[in-house]
């Protein structure tokens, strides 16, 4: 872990060195003209966008905005040490599922935004923990269906349509008789398969993802979903699809080579398909056999402020400024990442971009990823849920029960209520 590798070295650093650190927010540094300085941490790819919006903020607030380039997750992992040491930026971007833990641990500034009307309940839920708001939503993400337009005239609408692809000789897998690569999904990955489980009535935590004592990954619906996944692994897919370590590479290869007509993936994959000059389409994931919609995790990222900032008012102003209608849409124009801001999202949808529209439509059925710290135990505890059943290692119910028991035991061991 990055935090452990840093050890006590940062804590042992002299306060003089800390005070001179370029990105320090603990000493309330001033620019050469005497103005206050607000440090904004973003990845290199977002620097140009921040440059384009910071001037107006600087003029309106008589402040200098300094940009610090750092990978988002590295910045978040460093915050618990860098913050107290005075080396953290004032504001930064954070994945929604990291906000809860950092907020509860006291590393993020809880804010009282003056206007949340530009966001829906689903968006605000992802930046709120225990009734406290720790950020402003910027981007929404969820899984969608990609399909090859050279192979399919229209996007499949139902999973029955996807099953029909297995009968198409174009997608027969030469190495294994009777197997097909017509439709592929990395269901051994819990992030990818959760939409299937949720579509059948499974859930991670009760009370909108806040009750870690109520886990619904082994209820009747979840087990039914796993049984349906087993059908794909046993009847349709090559055996290699059970290998969680290599399945994604296999899926991407098949799709890029035109041997898979449709796959489930995230919006971040589109750049690779575009670069490969693949004639791809994007659409919502087809309706499940039970008539319900696939309900993948809803995620994304938002603006947050360090609890250690010496400019909390300015930091909060930046969070609202950077997430407002105009700037949220400008971010979309620059990055093609779908806005959390509802006005900006509507404008983005009007551009008739297929990928954008697919994400927006799928997001309607998506479930916010629980942002409480206990979610970390779900990722590890549920990773073998589908594999154990699909490989025949365990029965469907036993596989689900064992996964839930592992999650419960880990939560009991690591988290005290």
UniProtKB/Swiss-Prot annotation:
Positions where lipid (S-diacylglycerol cysteine) attaches: 23
Compartments in which it is found: Cell membrane
Taxonomic superkingdom: Bacteria
Regulation: Inhibited by glucose and lactose.
Stored CDD domains: PBP2_CMBP
Lipid-modified sites (N-palmitoyl cysteine): 23
Induction, per UniProt: Induced by maltose and repressed by glucose.
Protein family per UniProt: Belongs to the bacterial solute-binding protein 1 family.
Cited function: Part of the ABC transporter complex involved in maltodextrin import. Binds maltodextrin. Can also bind maltose with low affinity, but is not involved in its uptake.
Record-linked PANTHER family: MALTOSE-BINDING PERIPLASMIC PROTEIN, MALTOSE_MALTODEXTRIN-BINDING PERIPLASMIC PROTEIN
Other facts: Maltodextrin can also be transported inside the cell after degradation to maltose by extracellular amylase AmyE, transported as maltose by MalP.
Protein name listed in UniProt: Maltodextrin-binding protein MdxE
Organism: Bacillus subtilis (strain 168)
Gene expressing this chain: mdxE
């Amino acid at each position: 872990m990055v935090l452990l590798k840093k050890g006590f070295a940062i804590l042992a650093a002299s306060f003089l060195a800390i005070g001179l650190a370029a990105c320090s927010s603990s000493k309330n540094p001033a620019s050469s003209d005497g103005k206050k300085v607000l440090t904004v941490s973003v990845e290199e790819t977002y620097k140009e966008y921040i440059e384009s919006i910071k001037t107006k903020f600087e003029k309106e607030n008589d402040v200098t905005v300094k940009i610090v380039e750092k990978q988002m997750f590295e910045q978040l992992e460093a915050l618990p040490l860098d913050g107290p040491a005075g080396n953290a930026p004032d504001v930064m971007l954070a994945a929604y599922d990291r906000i809860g833990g950092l907020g509860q641990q006291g590393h993020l500034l809880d804010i009282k935004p003056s206007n949340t009307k530009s966001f829906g309940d689903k968006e605000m839920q992802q930046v709120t923990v225990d009734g406290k708001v720790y950020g402003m939503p910027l981007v929404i993400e969820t899984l969608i269906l990609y399909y090859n337009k050279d192979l399919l005239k229209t996007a499949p609408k139902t999973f029955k349509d996807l099953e029909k692809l297995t009968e198409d000789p174009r997608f027969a897998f030469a190495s294994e008789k009777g197997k097909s690569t017509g439709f592929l999904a990395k269901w051994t990955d819990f992030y990818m398969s959760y939409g299937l489980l949720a579509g059948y009535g499974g859930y991670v935590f009760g009370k909108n993802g806040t009750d870690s004592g109520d886990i619904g990954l082994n209820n009747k619906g979840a087990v039914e979903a796993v049984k349906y996944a087993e059908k794909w692994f046993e009847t349709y897919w090559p055996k290699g699809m059970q290998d969680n370590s290599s399945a994604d590479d296999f899926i991407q290869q098949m799709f890029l080579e035109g041997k898979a007509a449709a796959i489930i993936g995230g919006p971040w994959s589109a750049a690779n398909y575009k670069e490969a000059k693949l004639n791809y389409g994007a659409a919502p994931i087809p309706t499940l056999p039970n008539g319900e919609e696939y309900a993948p995790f809803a995620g994304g990222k938002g603006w947050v402020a360090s609890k250690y900032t010496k400019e909390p008012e300015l930091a909060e102003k930046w969070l609202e400024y950077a997430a407002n209608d105009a700037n949220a849409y400008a971010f979309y124009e620059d990055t093609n990442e779908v806005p959390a801001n509802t006005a900006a999202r509507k404008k983005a949808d009007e551009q008739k971009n297929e990928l954008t529209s697919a994400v927006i439509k799928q997001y309607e059925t998506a479930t916010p990823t629980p942002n409480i710290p206990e979610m970390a135990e779900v990722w590890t505890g549920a990773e073998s849920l589908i594999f154990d059943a699909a490989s025949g290692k365990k029965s469907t119910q036993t596989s689900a029960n064992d996964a839930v028991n592992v999650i419960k035991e880990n939560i009991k061991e690591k988290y005290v209520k």
